From Swiss-Prot:
Name the UniProt record assigns to this protein: RuBisCO large subunit-binding protein subunit beta-2
GO BP annotation list: protein refolding
Entry annotated with the keyword Chloroplast: yes
Sorted UniProt keywords: ATP-binding, Chaperone, Chloroplast, Nucleotide-binding, Plastid, Stress response
Quaternary structure and partners: Oligomer of probably six alpha and six beta subunits.
Species this chain originates from: Chlamydomonas reinhardtii
GO CC, any one term: chloroplast
Induction statement: By heat shock.
GO molecular function, one term: ATP binding
Family: Belongs to the chaperonin (HSP60) family.
Length: 259
């Protein structure tokens, strides 16, 4: 019934239901609404409002947002946000096709990752990727370290600084480039906020313009979770890990002889 009420507000109509004392037998033209366009297919119906009820729609959206803020259940919150998107005209359907079930699942996961990244970007914005943002953050650690009086805390600050500079070196090394050289070149251009290394093209350029970006929320959460895991290791009395297996030496090639 909530969806029907949303449609009624969008079109300026009235929901026909017993609670309002209206039945189909008693319904008149007054309960009908108007729409600029209605598209009906086998699987979906799309209703486009004509703008007459914009004020009522905004009030309805505000009401649903308040409900979503008070709801703790993720499923219910997702459905409420879906209603907000539909009333606001922000609904998109992504259809994914594939030749095999395995390929379909893999594509579906990629689309979900892209959607989650987009949602995160909308929430907190974006920063340049390629490990360059973390490298720039590492330069802020020294000023924080100066405010610390505990030597152990200062040691922790040094560890975080080294860790923040590691991703860009790893990305460069995986691309077949000297990670230390790449890191130093980015640091030499620290005054250019979007300057960085594009591993895909092996070039130094404006990463924001090149589309090499990360959602700010993803970068922040990754750093927070990494620090949390490290803290757990430091506080644990014992850490159990698998014993690394030694690589077996290749058997010597059988030598040929004269017969």
């Amino acid at each position: 019934s909530s969806y029907l009420e949303d449609i009624a507000i969008l079109t300026g109509g009235t929901v026909v239901k017993d609670e309002l004392g209206i039945t189909l037998e008693k319904a008149t033209e007054e309960v009908l609404g108007l729409a600029a366009k209605v598209s009906i297919s086998k699987e979906a119906t799309t209703i486009v409002g004509d703008g007459r009820t914009q004020q009522q729609v905004e009030g309805r959206v505000k009401q649903i947002r308040n409900l979503a803020a008070e709801t703790e259940q993720e499923y219910e919150k997702e459905k409420l946000n879906e209603r907000i998107a539909r009333l606001s005209g922000g609904v998109a359907i992504i259809q994914v096709g594939a030749q095999t079930e395995t390929e379909l699942k893999e594509k579906k996961l990629r689309v979900e990752d892209a959607l989650n990244a987009t949602k995160a970007a909308v929430e907190e914005g974006i920063v340049i990727g390629g490990g360059c943002t973390l490298l720039r953050l590492s330069q802020k650690v020294d000023s924080i370290k100066e405010t610390l009086s505990n030597e152990e805390q200062k040691m922790g600050a040094d560890i975080i600084k080294r860790a923040l500079s590691y991703p860009i070196k790893l990305i460069a090394n995986n691309a077949g480039t000297n990670g230390s050289v790449v890191m130093q070149r980015v640091m030499d251009n620290i005054d250019q906020p979007y300057y960085g290394y594009n591993a895909a093209t092996d070039t130094f350029e404006d990463l924001m313009e090149a589309g090499i970006i990360d959602p700010t929320k993803v970068v922040r959460c990754s750093l927070e979770n990494a620090v949390s895991v490290a803290k757990t290791f430091l506080l644990a009395d014992v850490v159990v890990t698998e014993i690394p297996e030694k690589e077996k030496a290749p058997a010597p090639a059988a030598g040929g002889g004269d017969y």
